[in-house]
Amino acid sequence: MAEQSSRNLDTGRAGIILAGGRSRRFDGIDKATAPVGGRPMIHRVAASLDPAVDELVINCRADQRDTFAAALSDFDVRFAEDSHPDHGPVFGLRTAVRASNAEYAAILPCDMPLVPTGFISHLFGRVQGGTGVIPSVSETPVPLPSVVHCRAGEVACTETIRAGSDRLKDVMSTLGVNVLDGREVQAHAGLDAFSNVNTIDDLRALSSRR
């Protein structure tokens, strides 16, 4: 039987940005603050989420907070600092949903700056009272971007951690999320929307397309 969360029943929508990684493939720079179109990448992600949500929650390490606060000064954000830094995105997601007051949360990584707000809104519309919804990209379900029920997501993260996994796709499997097919996804977002910026070369390629 799944463990019960101690959270109270919440309402509303949150936008969660997972940004606690070390950017080890980014030449020593925190990729969240790398410029995309003249703005820090994390600012671009926040700008995608903000119109579709009631609150923004930023998961990060304590040493990133001041830099991110400056980069996100245009937004009203809540920080959810990692209590277990460097333990991966499942710990980060659990920290973020615990910090949120929302019933559902849209989740984006800090390195996916092209997801349109309309697609985030579509995910919220498609969750339909369930535990979560994720897209299928090139016929493969992907865990981000996604919308999940915060309380159920917290429990699923805990169960995934206890099972020894640090993979978000295992969280989504535990949740039993719905998967949007590729045609529906493409109707609301181009394939470029799901591009991750993992390296400096990825950033250059992204900049050349803009």
UniProtKB/Swiss-Prot annotation:
GO terms for cellular component: cytoplasm. GTP binds at residues 18-20, 31, 59, 86, 111. It comes from the Archaea. It catalyses: Mo-molybdopterin + GTP + H(+) = Mo-molybdopterin guanine dinucleotide + diphosphate. Its EC number is 2.7.7.77. Its main location: cytoplasm. One of its GO terms (biological process) is Mo-molybdopterin cofactor biosynthetic process. GO terms for molecular function: GTP binding; metal ion binding; molybdenum cofactor guanylyltransferase activity. It is found in: Cytoplasm. Its cofactor is Mg(2+). Keywords: Cytoplasm, GTP-binding, Magnesium, Metal-binding, Molybdenum cofactor biosynthesis, Nucleotide-binding, Transferase. InterPro entries: MobA-like_NTP_Trfase (IPR025877), Molybde_CF_guanTrfase (IPR013482), Nucleotide-diphossugar_trans (IPR029044). Mg(2+) binds at residue 111. Gene3D superfamilies: Spore Coat Polysaccharide Biosynthesis Protein SpsA, Chain A. Pfam families: NTP_transf_3. The N-terminal domain determines nucleotide recognition and specific binding, while the C-terminal domain determines the specific binding to the target protein. Transfers a GMP moiety from GTP to Mo-molybdopterin (Mo-MPT) cofactor (Moco or molybdenum cofactor) to form Mo-molybdopterin guanine dinucleotide (Mo-MGD) cofactor. Belongs to the MobA family. This is Probable molybdenum cofactor guanylyltransferase. It comes from Haloferax mediterranei (strain ATCC 33500 / DSM 1411 / JCM 8866 / NBRC 14739 / NCIMB 2177 / R-4) (Halobacterium mediterranei). The lineage of its organism: Archaea, Methanobacteriati, Methanobacteriota, Stenosarchaea group, Halobacteria.
